[in-house]
Amino acid sequence: MSLSERQKEEINRAIAEYMQNNGYSESFSVFLKESSLSENDIKPLGGILEKKWTTVLRLQRKVNDLESKLQESQREINHGAPTRDKRQAADWIPRPPETQKLTGHRLPITRVIFHPLWTIMASCSEDATIKVWDYETGQLERTLKGHTDAVNDIAIDAAGKQLVSCSSDLSIKLWDFGQTYDCLKSLKGHEHTVSSVTFLPTGDFVLSASRDHTIKQWDISTGYCVYTFRGHNDWVRMIRISNDGTLFASASLDQTVTVWSFATKSAKLVLRDHEHAVECVEWAPDTAYTNVTGQQPEGNSTHILFSGSRDRSIKAWNINTGDVLFTLLAHENWVRGLAFHPKGKYLISVADDKTLRVWELSAQRCMKAIEAHEHFVSTVAFHQTSPFVITGSVDMSCKVWECR
């Protein structure tokens, strides 16, 4: 395939601009002479040669991904397994191999999250940084620096415009997300490592949990702590807010899960059935209620909470009664993260046994186990509208898994 004269001229101009901008003065002069260009012909092209090179690399990655997916689909067809086209969206689950392996962090990954609107995700690490990635191409978009110790948790508000992070440096930071990526504010008040953070649904408050045994509510506009929740007697590992925004749950090393009311600013329930520290909690989406309970929801009775523990178990709780609905057992080490399929049929869990497991909630069984990483798997997230799951590990990598 030959190039037209116009295409040749465009390529020559792009090469000349690259040489000129990168200090290849002698080569630049020779190239102008041999290509019959003059310096007047070299107009600013905005680094088009580098952009085209980057585009080629991205396209090559996508070609490789498509080839992998084609091979996987062919294997499924050969073995009689249903292809993605034959499955309903509610039945799509993560399947190996991963579509992307993201490397760049220098210490273990502590949290991964999806942006609610764009095809990007964020990861944070014990290396004190937050990284922003395009999860479809695997491209690192940006690194946020500002913390001076491990970043333990991150969250993005519902509008996708702000990110909040918390750290072992005792601070919480608010970041612009999408425009400048600048740190907008630092919130200080905890007396020990800040381990978990999340936005309230309204977006004007942030909730944080700490190794100082407390949970704090912060006003974003002022940066001040407006309330401190006390009740745990050990490190609070994770906090999660209910889907309707009326309650939140906290998991602690004191082996309990506490459910708190925003209205009364007090504990509604203390859940005690785990035999070791509780690492994670996650509220089941309303779509999961029937799969979890076998009943149709009545009124506001859809508060179902799941917890994962160092005792290797996952428990489902009825928050109206405080009872354990059932316990899921299959992991061989600490359970570190939970995420629900948006359609409510499956629960995804990750653990220090290096696996990602898919649980069918209606049958209360582990239907699939994936050897996800080479070391402990510390975090997992399920995209709410696209068929992707991401995991992060102590092996310093994040992986993107397509659901099909």
UniProtKB/Swiss-Prot annotation:
GO biological process, one term: nuclear migration
One Gene Ontology cellular component annotation held by this UniProt entry: neuronal cell body
Annotated LisH domain residues: 7-39
Region (Disordered): 69-90
A Pfam family that the UniProt record links to this protein: LisH_PAC1
Keywords on record: Cell cycle, Cell division, Centromere, Chromosome, Coiled coil, Cytoplasm, Cytoskeleton, Developmental protein, Differentiation, Kinetochore, Microtubule, Mitosis, Neurogenesis, Nucleus, Oogenesis, Repeat, Transport, WD repeat
Cytoplasm found in the keyword field: yes
UniProt tissue specificity: Expressed in all classes of neurons in the ventral cord. Expressed in the multinucleate spermathecal valves and adult seam cells.
Basic and acidic residues: bias regions: 69-89
Subcellular location: Cytoplasm, Cytoskeleton; Cytoplasm, Cytoskeleton, Microtubule organizing center, Centrosome; Chromosome, Centromere, Kinetochore; Nucleus envelope
Disruption of the gene: reported phenotype: Defects lead to convulsions mimicking epilepsy, possibly due to altered neurotransmitter function. RNAi-mediated knockdown results in arrest at the 50-100 cell stage, whereby egg and sperm pronuclei fails to migrate. RNAi-mediated knockdown prevents the sperm-donated centrosome from leaving the posterior cortex in 1-cell embryos. RNAi-mediated knockdown results in an abnormal distribution of GABAergic synaptic vesicles at synaptic termini of the ventral nerve cord.
Classification via InterPro entries: Dynein_regulator_LIS1, G-protein_beta_WD-40_rep, LIS1_N, LisH, PAC1-like_LisH-like_dom, WD40/YVTN_repeat-like_dom_sf, WD40_repeat_CS, WD40_repeat_dom_sf
Keyword Repeat: yes
Transmembrane spans: none
SMART domains tied to this protein: LisH, WD40
SUPFAM superfamilies: Lissencephaly-1 protein (Lis-1, PAF-AH alpha) N-terminal domain, WD40 repeat-like
Free-text note on domains in this protein's UniProt record: Dimerization mediated by the LisH domain may be required to activate dynein.
Cited HAMAP family: lis1
Homology family: Belongs to the WD repeat LIS1/nudF family.
Function of the molecule: Positively regulates the activity of the minus-end directed microtubule motor protein dynein. May enhance dynein-mediated microtubule sliding by targeting dynein to the microtubule plus end. Required for several dynein- and microtubule-dependent processes such as nuclear migration during cell division. Part of a complex with nud-2, which is recruited to the nuclear envelope by unc-83, where, in turn, it recruits dynein to the nuclear surface and regulates nuclear migration in hypodermal precursor cells. Plays a role in GABAergic synaptic vesicle localization in the ventral nerve cord.
Protein name from the UniProt record: Lissencephaly-1 homolog
